[in-house]
A protein has these predicted regions:
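Phosphate/pyrophosphate-binding betaalpha-module
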Residues: 1-62
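Well-ordered secondary-structure scaffolds
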Residues: 17, 44-54, 58-310
Length: 310
């Protein structure tokens, strides 16, 4: 699978399948990287106008007809407070729209992992289950549906929300969504039978263990960023640009806020390269999850929708 296809191939794949999941290119809005370097030494990394410019630079340069953005709020969000997340979402929607690209920004909850997994291969497993219609009521599917509804409306492919939801449900239940994903993988150089035989292609960690809590209780809160950084430490992300990524590691079967855990119900399953790495990740996960006796519910998933003002 080639995540960095030549522009011609990228265009051909989009024309033939309707989608291409690829990495960014340094040739599009190249000044962004240099400007970030200046921000880093001028204490302006947290400047919302400059963050907005950085986020939108490549997107506007690519010539989009419309844009839908997902801006997170909560312990796993890029911005440190709900107020800052809200300010960023509004800024992105307005600036992009005023630059000629009608934009909608959804403010969605990230106070816990969006999916019951975090990593690379484990997230692909979840993705395939979603495409097969096996996670109809999951949090990640709810967010995906809201984003897709906005995209269909922005692209003038449907007249309203009800028509968009009908179209989405049909794509999932008919198998069309899974079929298009499989075709995209094949067109970008991946295996033709990936959907049918994904287990044969996805990396599997040598050490897979359940992570049990030190005491029983109900999940009250997550430090979602800490969960993500634990995956990075396992090798599932990069701390340096030249570092390699271990696609096999991460967490699966992660509990949600409001779930009860004990000696029989683990917090998650850790996938690691070594026993030592698994033990460190397990300790980090326990520290990232707050347990208590009270019933708990997650924050509202879709919190606000910002439509750009011209």
């Amino acid at each position: 699978y080639d995540p960095y296809p030549a522009p011609e191939r990228f265009s051909d794949v989009v024309k033939s399948t309707g989608v291409a999941i690829i990495g960014q290119t340094g040739n599009l809005a190249p000044a962004d990287k240099r400007i970030y370097g200046v921000r880093d030494v001028t204490a302006t990394v947290e400047s919302i106008p400059l963050i907005t410019a950085s986020i939108l630079g490549k997107k506007l340069a690519s010539g989009l007809d419309a844009l839908v953005m997902d801006v997170k709020v909560g312990s796993g969000a890029f911005m440190p407070t709900p107020e800052k997340s809200r300010e960023l979402a509004k800024s992105i929607a307005n600036v992009a729209t005023q630059a000629g690209t009608p934009t909608t920004a959804l403010l969605t909850d990230m106070s816990q992992p969006l999916a019951p997994c975090a990593g690379n291969a484990v997230e692909i497993v979840e993705t395939l289950a979603l495409l097969r219609g096996e996670r109809a009521n999951s949090r990640v599917m709810q967010v995906t549906r809201e984003l897709a509804v906005e995209m269909l409306i922005a692209g003038k492919l449907v007249a309203n929300r009800e028509e968009a939801l009908t179209k989405l449900d049909k794509a999932l239940t008919s198998g069309a969504a899974a079929e298009v994903f499989a075709r995209m993988v094949r067109e970008l150089g991946g295996p033709a039978d990936f959907m049918e035989r994904s287990d044969s292609y996805l990396a599997t960690a040598p050490v897979i263990q359940a992570v049990y809590p030190e005491q029983s209780g109900i999940v009250q809160r997550f430090d979602t960023r800490a969960v993500g950084m634990s995956v990075v430490e396992l090798g599932g992300g990069r701390l340096r640009n030249d570092a390699s990524v271990d696609h096999s590691v991460g967490f699966s079967d992660i509990v949600e806020i409001g779930d009860r855990v004990d000696s029989q119900r683990p917090l998650a399953i850790v996938h690691a390269r070594t026993e030592e790495a698994a033990a460190r990740a397990a300790a980090q996960l326990r520290a990232a999850v707050t347990l208590g006796d009270a019933e708990a519910t997650a924050d509202t998933l879709l919190q606000e929708t910002f439509r750009g003002e011209a």
